[in-house]
Amino acid sequence: MKPAFFAALASAFLVTGQAMAAPPSPTVSGFWQQADDDGHVGAWFYFVLRDGVYEGRLVKMFKPPGDEAPISTCSKCEGDQKDAPMMGLTIIKGMHRNGTKYDEGSILDPRDGTVYHAQMELAPDGQKLSVRGYVGVPLLGKTQVWTRLPDDAIAPADLPKESLGPDAAPPPTPAPAKTAAVKPPKGQKPPAIPK
């Protein structure tokens, strides 16, 4: 009887010790870079956990090569986002986390004000994020792969004040970045960030 009891007790300590030693799985919290299919960086986003769901806010835009300056307000948006400044605008809303997958959310295209269903999936190492916007069913949509940026990509003082919001949780300690500090792509200059 005693050997079985001690074996069970040792197993319990072993399992508990392994669970306590496992690092937390990464989340989408933090900075992300979005690029188009040609590799031109379009924007940086900041994800936070708010009221139990994740949202992503626009924190930096880049001028596309050969295009005019990026739009400054969401003139085609509806509701409380109508004519809101682009910097700090919530583009992705209501994302519920289930492991590395996020769903039940929406994504806004600020160019035309259209809101699409959205789902996301975080790579196991936490450095890539597949973002899919769709109409009706996920099969009818488009996916972009975003890249995680270092936590110090933008100093907190330089973030649009709307980016964090009053009840946003600070991002957890991120997974270690595998790249050096990210600079704007060659030939692109970031616009001045309003304070």
Go through the PLM ranges and name each one.
Residues M1-A7:
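Bacterial N-terminal signal peptides that target proteins for export
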Residues Q34, H40-Q119, L159, K183-K195:
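Central antiparallel beta-sheet cores of small beta-barrel/beta-sandwich binding domains
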Residues T100-D151:
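Surface-exposed interaction patches
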Residues M20-S29:
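N-terminal helix-cap/turn-to-beta initiation motif at the start of protein domains
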Residues A21, I154-K195:
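Compositionally biased, proline/threonine/alanine/serine-rich low-complexity intrinsically disordered stretches
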Residues F31, V53, G126-K128:
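Structural motif
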